[in-house]
Design a protein with these regions (language model features):
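Membrane-embedded alpha-helical bundles that constitute the cytochrome b-like, heme-associated redox core
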Residues: 1-176
Length: 176
């Protein structure tokens, strides 16, 4: 299997970006909802730091994925797709990427505006002044962007199932 995409399927690197992101998000989203229910404590702060580190990892995987996509064309879609399907797929992908970036950035800004430090590997980052109004606003953005991401992932999976079962095209095989 080639590292680069071909006309028939995605290359190994694109597949790894896709499936690693999927697996991490399947764990990260419920983890985030679990954190919401925890009382404030040292344990919660430790778990939030893990959550943030995972989120930053997804951010960078997505960034590298987009850079790779820019320099490496996607497989052809074939003649069975009409323009509306292609437009919907492109919009879904665009908003998937946008929601991932929005979730990460808003989560980090929420934490920093709460006056907390962001522990990233061996460094601590923070703002000199807290702003609880902005922290609440970024928290709301973080939550709603997660709901958007969940919806988009569900639509993405549904579209793949429909294509695989009803249209019997090879769209799923391209990414496996």
């Amino acid at each position: 299997m080639s590292i680069f995409n071909s006309q028939k399927e995605y290359g190994i690197l694109a597949k790894l970006f896709h499936w690693i992101t999927f697996v991490i998000l399947i764990a990260q989203i419920p983890f985030g909802f679990y954190l919401v229910g925890l009382e404030f404590s040292d344990r919660r702060i430790d778990l939030e730091n893990i959550h943030i580190l995972i989120g930053i990892t997804v951010f960078y995987i997505t960034l590298f994925r987009l850079i790779w996509k820019f320099f490496n064309s996607s497989p052809t879609v074939g003649n069975s797709f009409f323009k509306g399907q292609i437009l919907i797929a492109k919009a879904n992908h665009f908003f998937l990427y946008l929601s991932i970036f929005t979730i990460t950035i808003s989560g980090i800004l929420k934490k920093l505006y709460m006056g907390e430090k962001l522990n990233f590997i061996f460094f601590k980052y923070g703002f000199n002044k807290d702003n609880f109004v902005l922290a609440d606003a970024f928290y709301e953005v973080h939550i709603y962007a997660n709901y958007l991401l969940i919806t988009l992932v569900a639509l993405h999976i549904l579209a793949v199932i429909v294509h695989h079962i009803f249209f019997k095209d090879k769209i799923l095989k391209k990414i496996l």
